[in-house]
């Protein structure tokens, strides 16, 4: 068969914080959760290096998707621009 079935790939939504590199952006993804013991709402963020084919710029909200390793740090790619 010509069509291969790929596994489900993770997607995340975040804000572009840096687009100074060629074809690469840094996306900050925020996570809000309740602390298991103290029940306080905690806001946590993490940065992901993503491949940028859509030429998004800083401040834009984007959806990124997991992909094969593209470089030492890049394992995500920008799939779509959200607003």
Swiss-Prot record:
One GO CC term, this protein: cytosolic small ribosomal subunit
GO biological process terms held by the UniProt record: translation
The keyword Glycosyltransferase appears for this protein: no
The entry's keywords: Ribonucleoprotein, Ribosomal protein, RNA-binding, rRNA-binding
Superkingdom classification of source: Bacteria
Disulfide bonds: none
Single annotated GO MF: structural constituent of ribosome
Biological function: One of the primary rRNA binding proteins, it binds specifically to the 5'-end of 16S ribosomal RNA.
Subunit structure: Part of the 30S ribosomal subunit.
Family (UniProt): Belongs to the universal ribosomal protein uS17 family.
UniProt name for this protein: Small ribosomal subunit protein uS17
Species this protein is from: Chlamydia felis (strain Fe/C-56)
